[in-house]
Amino acid sequence: MVGKGNECAAARRRFSLRAAAASSSSSSFLPCLLLAAALSAGCCRAHAATARAPRSLLARFPTTKMTSELEKEAGRYVDDSSQAARTNNKITNLQVSFVGHGHDTPADGEGQFADAAYPAKWKPDQDPSTPSLVVAHHLPNGNAPFIDAAYPVKWSPRADGPPKQPATFPASPNGEKAEFTDSAYSVKWSPRSVAPPKAPGIFAQHSNGNKAQFTDAAYPVDWNPRSVAPPTPPAALSSLAHPAAGIHIQRGMLFLMKKLHPGAVLPEGTKLALPHGDHGVAAAAPRFIYKDKGDAVPFDLRAMDAILAMFGILPGSDKAAQVADTLRACSELTAAGGGGEEPRACCATSREAVLDFAASALGTSAPRAVTTLVHGREPRRYVVAADGVARIGGDAVVACHPMPYLYEVYYCHRPADAVALRVDLHAVADVGLGGATAVAVCHVNTTTWDSAYFELLKASRGDAICHYMPQGYVLWLAN
């Protein structure tokens, strides 16, 4: 796709007009706002479902507006292009923009994200002073595959129920997928997708399927024997036909809302920080390219050869396969939204698109972004702190998850029936180690979810199910 900017700009203008009309109207909420994050042939529009949380459960959690620490964590990813975008979009009061990825280093110096997004810092010599089409110096290890995400996510327009057949992907002897580190929210992939890479990476691997599920992570995923992780819609985390088919969830990532309370101990090995390499340094990840240059870069599976050549990626490599999977998933998402059926998800290839989607989906000109903050080294086990759980935001959230690509591409969606929580976590018995201020999302209407989830969590159908959003994932709030 070339020339995405014109469609995005038109969508943003339409949103600005609607937002202005809404502000002068007595109506408190527009049932369906136009989304300004446009993909090749169409624009995404937000789903306007309101979360219906169990009052008895949510009453236990105080509502707080104290998200400044998490906002600070998310707000270090602002540059001139996003400032200009906010001006053009009349988003003048935006408090934070977006998170970035980088090297885990608390050292002082220029290029640092001050207390940063997982404490992160960009090396000055790696941050281009001028916009450039070529961001190969931000790409990890040439043709090596991208690092796996925290839990793969997929949007499927046909994902109204559990898959018709159980997955048969083999598990490794220790009960985890050999090909993946845990990932968070998988994206839908084509049947022509390849086997998952064996090297670690920061983004989730994805696969095809008419199945809507999560994998190896905060959301489990059903596996296709011929490819990698399949899909999951925001409306339902349906996955496998039965646990024997192989649900694998990142330790401690998925839990019941009713079991979230001060003193609750998370499973040993729960990881909320970015993956680290052999030298204890957070893996580098691609960054957004500048919007004016991004419009000139094709984002279309039909231009695959040109894209690989532009970024110096070897055809047939694992990374090339991941690039193809992301392009295919986003093109299918665009096609699904072309019929005016209110798709609730969008692939965003620029900060402007992310901001536009969040603003229009939440019905506000000033959305706030929050992300999980890890304090120092992660302990072996976390425990929920006293008075450590509070509700943040209202009845609508927008979650954005990174996808494996040559520059930053985010899968953003507004899940139905979801509420956001801030959870303060401390180390258990690990003196000197830090804790975390985590963001969690709870899905309060699980009546249509696959029974495998309830068996896994020893829960009853309809119980509210939550998951943490690890570093690298961003949650947008309306207030």
UniProtKB/Swiss-Prot annotation:
Residues 254-479 form the BURP domain. Glycans are attached at residue 445. Residues 158-177 are annotated as: Disordered. PROSITE patterns: BURP. InterPro entries: BURP (IPR044816), BURP_dom (IPR004873). Keywords: Glycoprotein, Signal. Residues 1-46 form the signal peptide. Expressed in stamen. Pfam families: BURP (PF03181). Coiled coil: none annotated. This is BURP domain-containing protein 4. It comes from Oryza sativa subsp. japonica (Rice).
